[in-house]
Amino acid sequence: MKNNYTSLKSSMDEGDELKTGHEFDLEKGILPEYNSEEEGALPPYSDISKLANPVPEDSSTGPTETTNPNVERRQEFKDSHPNIYSLLRLLISVLAVIVVFFTAWVCVNPLEKSIFGKVAFSVTIGITCPIVFIAIFCFFETWTQAVAQCIKVTVIFLAQCVKVTVISLAKCVKVIAVGLYNSKKDLVVTIWLAWVVICFILFGCVKDGRLNLNKALICSTSSISAALFFILLLVCIPIWTLKHMLFGLFQVLGVQSCVVIVTKGLMYLLDKHIDATGYEIEASSLFVIGNFLFFYEMERPGALKRMPKFIGNGIASFLGGIANAIRGIANAIGGIANAFRGANDNNDIPLGEMDVESEV
């Protein structure tokens, strides 16, 4: 008979065996006996021992020191090129002594006539220069590291200062721009009133004869307009819409130029020379047109682009209205004619027919 052997261990028992560590690692070998009576002893290969002793086994050499890469490069250069390194130290030391000597020559030499000047110059040349030479040549590495660290700290400090200054200026400009943009209506009215006052002053100077008429026309159409446009550019709209603003400015100046050309052409065609009154009318009309076009462009961007189409539609609507009016007048005249024609037809009925109709 075959003995059918079945294990009475359940899956939970097998899991407990794994947890208790009855299985041994093939690489580490069989676990040694564990004496629980020893104080502070922990079972080997356990996770608790790893946590209790986090220092690796090969850490007996001590902690490694972090070295500066600049110091390493300098040491490598010194070891590989000792002659060049010594020559460089000597050259820098001599240059420092030369700088000290010329500084003493410039500052102390004018006082050489006095005893104090002679003593100061002698001390500077005889004591200070050798001390500077010895200090720089013998302690070259120390003071170069100190100077490099000082330069590094200074550069970082200056960079931080520049960064903070730029950020502060940007915030100030943003606050000012937002404030001006939010209060644009009041400022626009103020600038517009100032423009009106300036133009009236110019017109008054023209009237009194203290200003040439051509200059008044140029000032009223070019200088004042350009100044106002650029001031309103900074007040009414953000600075980044400069392209749109300049385009509107050139469009307004173009319209003003067209008005000037048309006005002068009509006056010359009618054999009327432009006198003082003509110049005043022209300048005033340009002033009004410039104001209207500019404020209309500011309230509705792109209005100047749509203006030719708008004018064409207006002219077409006006001509259409005139055509409709003429058509209405023609229809009215036709109705009146039909009425007169009907009256004439009634008058042409014979008298005999009228008597017959009355008898019936």
Swiss-Prot record:
Q: Which GO terms describe its cellular component?
A: cytoplasm; vacuolar membrane
GO biological process, any: meiotic drive
Record key words, sorted? Membrane, Transmembrane, Transmembrane helix, Vacuole
Task performed by this protein: Acts as a suppressor component of the dual wtf meiotic drive system, and can suppress but not confer meiotic drive by compatible poisons. Wtf meiotic drive systems promote unequal transmission of alleles from the parental zygote to progeny spores by encoding a poison and an antidote from the same locus; the poison is trans-acting and forms toxic aggregates in all spores within an ascus, wherease the antidote is spore-specific and targets aggregates for degradation by the vacuole.
Instruction: Name the chain's protein.
Output: Meiotic drive suppressor wtf13
Oligomeric state and partners?
Homomer. Interacts with other proteins that exhibit high sequence similarity.
Q: Which positions, given as ranges, span the membrane?
A: 90-110, 120-140, 150-170, 186-206, 222-242, 246-266, 276-296, 310-330
Where is the major localization of this protein? membrane
